[in-house]
Amino acid sequence: GCKKDRKPCSYHADCCNCCLSGICAPSTNWILPGCSTSSFFKI
């Protein structure tokens, strides 16, 4: 399974949508709109 939004993550598979700066981000994130279907970002 994937971790909840704002939980720490190391890989894309850790999150339901995307991982930014090591944190799971919600697909409704206004900074990365539609991140659930976008490329994986790890900054």
UniProtKB/Swiss-Prot annotation:
4-hydroxyproline: residues carrying this PTM: 8, 26
Disulphides: 2-16, 9-19, 15-24, 18-35
Pfam families: Toxin_19
InterPro entries attached to this UniProt entry: Conotoxin-I_CS, Toxin_19
One cellular component term from this protein's GO annotations in UniProt: extracellular region
Sequence positions bearing D-phenylalanine: 41
Function: Iota-conotoxins bind to voltage-gated sodium channels (Nav) and act as agonists by shifting the voltage-dependence of activation to more hyperpolarized levels. Produces general excitatory symptoms.
Recorded domain comment: The cysteine framework is XI (C-C-CC-CC-C-C).
Protein name as it appears in the record: Iota-conotoxin-like Fi11.6
Organism for this UniProt entry: Conus figulinus (Fig cone)
